[in-house]
């Protein structure tokens, strides 16, 4: 059985050669379920990018999908190179987070074209698309709100579905639980945080899949 893990940095993992590879929450879950972890999550991914990860997982014939949404306050960089293309299934497109550290040309784009409200709306649309795509595929799946915590539309029913879980590893990154945080591991969680995340997620999987 192959489990697809889709998302942003919260779902990314260290390399197989890293001493802590087996201690990442995705690999703990895969071992518990006697499955192969197919980790598509990448740092900085937008929800659009996460949608393309789901598509890749379907092409790779994954059996189960665990999808972790990201903040809608990100955007796809379409003017650098030609990486956001149909030809490569949009796999190599660049994504960027809106923050003070953004590059000057990104701020030029943000000032002219970026709308936080539109990106939130796009996030809802993409979530609905992921939900319906996986529903139609017949695959087992769960979608976790994770870092998509802003401005849930009152008339949006997709976030009320049983397959959408109102939690994610992002919630462990808190001032109240500094022992779960790490600046050195790519998924932002300490080894203790990874263990806590895996236990909580296995509980959701057992209860909902």
Spans of model-derived segments:
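Serine-esterase "nucleophile elbow" of acetyl-processing enzymes
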Residues: 1-48, 55, 190
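Alpha-helical cap/lid subdomain in secreted, periplasmic
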Residues: 55-209
């Amino acid at each position: 059985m192959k489990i697809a893990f889709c998302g942003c940095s919260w779902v990314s993992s260290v390399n197989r050669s890293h001493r802590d590879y087996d201690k990442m929450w995705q690999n703990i879950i895969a071992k518990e379920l006697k499955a192969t972890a197919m980790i598509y999550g990448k740092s900085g991914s937008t929800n659009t990018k996460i949608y393309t990860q789901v598509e890749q997982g379907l092409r790779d014939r994954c059996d189960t999908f665990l999808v972790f949404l990201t903040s809608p306050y990100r955007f796809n960089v379409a003017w650098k190179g030609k990486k956001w293309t149909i030809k490569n299934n949009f796999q190599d497109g660049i994504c960027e987070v809106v923050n003070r550290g953004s590059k000057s040309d990104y701020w030029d784009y943000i000032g002219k074209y970026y709308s936080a409200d539109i990106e939130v709306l796009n996030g809802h649309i993409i979530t609905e698309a992921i939900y319906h795509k996986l529903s139609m595929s017949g695959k087992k799946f769960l979608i976790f709100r994770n870092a998509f915590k802003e401005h849930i539309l009152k008339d949006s029913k997709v976030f009320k579905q049983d397959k959408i879980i109102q939690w994610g590893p992002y919630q462990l990154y808190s001032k109240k639980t500094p022992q779960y945080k790490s600046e050195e591991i790519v998924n932002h969680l300490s080894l203790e945080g990874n263990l806590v995340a895996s236990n909580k997620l296995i509980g959701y999987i057992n209860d909902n899949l």
